[in-house]
């Protein structure tokens, strides 16, 4: 029996619902911090990395239907990518406009276990939910307005879907998260923070859209343009890049690269 992946529609004998979400984090600027010093009075090298968690808060949501605390997430809409769904769903469920950071990981569990505390079944013969997770950070409302045309509409979730949103410490989230799989994602988030993810900047490398074949192009290679198919690819790329809220775009001087960015 072969599973068929889809965006929430029944297809074949086994249904795999694709979904996406994120661990939304922020700094608690009101926290005064803990002093971590060695015996000689100098701050230890490990203290600076551990101190990241002193001021760090993550966002969890309560779903009244299941009476559970979980990460903001949701199913993909028709023709939607996981990246776009992650940003849209987190923004809709928390009311906070966000941008994606590093990819964290994925979880999978039978749909029948939705809302249950333990979700570790690997039965491939039952309907399944498959979820990808990223790190995400809040962005300014002005940035959200600026990217709105590229990203598309975001509609706040109603109270019947999400009735409470809380910012809590990592330690508190570990206690409050209802599901074992969500705690697995939290562990991956902690690993990324310990690796220095909060101190890094996002760099995206993007290939140009489909260009005219070299064998058919009679001009110089730097003037070889994108095709109508390439223009369509470039247009759809706009929505994907908006998920990361880039602040600067740099392109090669070659025409096909410039056309990809300009679309």
Regions found by a protein language model. Give the residues of each.
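Active-site loop signature of alpha/beta-hydrolase-fold enzymes
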Residues: 66, 106, 212
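N-terminal strand-loop-strand
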Residues: 2-71, 203-208
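A generic fold-level signal
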Residues: 15-17, 53, 126-129, 160, ...
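Short acidic, glycine/proline-rich loop/turn micro-motifs
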Residues: 70-74, 113-116, 215-220
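Active-site-proximal alpha-helix that buttresses catalytic centers in soluble enzyme cores
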Residues: 200-263
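Unchanged
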Residues: 76-179
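Short, structured interface segments
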Residues: 168-197
């Amino acid at each position: 029996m072969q599973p068929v992946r889809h965006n929430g529609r029944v297809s074949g004998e086994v249904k795999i619902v694709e979904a996406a979400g994120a661990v939304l984090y922020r700094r608690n600027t009101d926290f005064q911090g803990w002093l971590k010093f060695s015996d000689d009075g100098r701050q230890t090298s490990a203290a600076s990395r551990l101190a990241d968690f002193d001021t760090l808060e993550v966002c969890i949501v309560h779903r009244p239907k299941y009476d559970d605390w979980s990460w903001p997430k949701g199913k993909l809409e028709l023709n939607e990518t996981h990246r776009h769904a992650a940003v849209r769903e987190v923004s809709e469920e928390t009311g906070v406009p966000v941008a994606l950071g590093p990819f964290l990981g994925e979880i999978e569990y039978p749909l029948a276990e939705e809302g249950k505390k333990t979700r570790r079944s690997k039965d491939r013969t039952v309907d399944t939910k498959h979820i990808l997770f990223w790190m995400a950070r809040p962005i300014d409302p002005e940035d959200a307005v600026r990217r709105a045309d590229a990203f598309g509409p975001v509609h706040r979730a109603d109270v019947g879907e999400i009735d409470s949103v809380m910012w809590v410490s990592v330690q508190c989230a570990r206690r409050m998260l209802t599901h074992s799989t969500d705690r697995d994602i939290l562990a991956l988030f902690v690993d990324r923070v310990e690796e220095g993810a909060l101190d890094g900047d996002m760099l995206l490398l993007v290939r140009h859209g489909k260009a005219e074949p070299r064998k058919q192009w009679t001009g110089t290679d730097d003037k070889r343009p994108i095709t109508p198919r390439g223009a369509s690819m470039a247009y759809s790329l706009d929505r994907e890049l908006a998920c990361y809220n880039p602040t600067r775009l740099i392109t090669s001087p070659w025409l096909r690269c410039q056309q990809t960015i300009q679309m």
